[in-house]
């Protein structure tokens, strides 16, 4: 069952830090000698991925490439961070706990609440409900993610790595993809890799059983579906995107629970989605349900390449 004790495990007893943004987390890694920087140019095609792969396998530190080289030979204006959560200790630090089992127990309780236990001790359910309401996201007029707006959005200007030799192209591998249920307005945030097709086109690998695919079906082929891809942000926000949550708990609420404070969200500039305000990038756009393009191959985490397959195309309207 989920009880107020489970909540306290995360929010009181083993608190390490509540992260404001990714920068604060990286500074903490730097100060604890868990981060290295490479100041000379490193190619986004295979080279950066090769270095990160060696660090992961050795249990090495996180890394920032200050001068990632793009496909056209230019140096990107933006640094590239990799291997952020490559050890158990860094993962625990990112989540603000000493033992991730605490979070697992809470997630099990959220998915399988003990109704009988709550009926016997109704004040426990009330405390839990109040705690949940305090985790509701907070809407703000403008977020840090909108401090700079790319007037002519161009995905090829971002340091997106091609990690493996047979990959079909550069892939965003830690994206927070935000969509909205057109019937209820409920936002969903999932992690679906994105292949860069060009300046304003991205292939989105959401499978038929994912919420984003359900939203596209409900939108209908005659309408555009708004999409936003968020990069970076407080580490618990990234974790919430891959967590198996019950339908009545949003990723935004769970991110607030993990980070011990309400998640600030702000409205996109070119569509009506609300996104985490402290992420580093927001890529706004839309898909046209039914429009697909060949995505892949992609070297996946289980050690094999995913083959080419048809997936939705996102048209970028703002970065």
Annotate the PLM regions.
Residues 7-313, 317-319:
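Extended, highly charged
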């Amino acid at each position: 069952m989920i009880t107020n004790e489970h909540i306290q495990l995360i929010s009181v007893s083993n608190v390490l830090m509540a992260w404001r943004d990714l920068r604060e987390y990286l500074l903490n890694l730097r100060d604890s000698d868990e981060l290295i920087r490479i100041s000379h140019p490193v190619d986004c095609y295979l080279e950066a991925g090769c270095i990160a792969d060696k660090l992961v396998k050795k249990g090495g530190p996180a890394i920032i490439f200050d001068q990632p080289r793009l496909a056209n030979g230019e140096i990107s204006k933006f640094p590239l961070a990799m291997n952020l959560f490559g050890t158990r200790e860094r993962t625990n630090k990112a989540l603000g706990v000493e033992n991730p089992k605490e979070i697992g127990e809470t997630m099990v309780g959220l998915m399988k609440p003990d109704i009988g236990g709550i009926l016997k001790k109704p004040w426990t359910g009330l405390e839990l409900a109040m705690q949940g309401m305090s985790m509701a996201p907070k809407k703000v007029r403008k977020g840090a993610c909108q401090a700079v707006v790319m007037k002519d959005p161009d995905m090829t200007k971002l340091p997106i790595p091609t990690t493996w030799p047979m990959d079909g192209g550069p892939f965003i591998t830690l994206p927070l993809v935000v969509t909205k249920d057109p019937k209820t307005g409920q936002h969903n945030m999932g992690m679906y890799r994105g292949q860069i097709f060009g300046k304003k086109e991205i292939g989105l690998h959401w499978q038929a059983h994912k919420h984003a695919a359900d939203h596209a079906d409900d939108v209908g082929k005659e309408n555009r579906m708004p999409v936003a891809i968020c990069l970076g942000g407080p580490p618990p926000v990234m974790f919430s995107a891959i967590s198996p949550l019950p339908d009545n708990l949003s990723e935004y609420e769970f991110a607030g629970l993990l980070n011990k404070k309400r998640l600030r969200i702000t409205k996109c500039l070119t569509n009506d989605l609300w996104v985490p305000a402290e992420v580093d990038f927001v890529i706004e756009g839309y898909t046209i349900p039914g429009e697909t393009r060949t995505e892949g191959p992609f070297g996946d985490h289980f050690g094999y390449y995913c083959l080419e397959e048809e997936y939705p195309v996102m048209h970028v309207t703002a970065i």
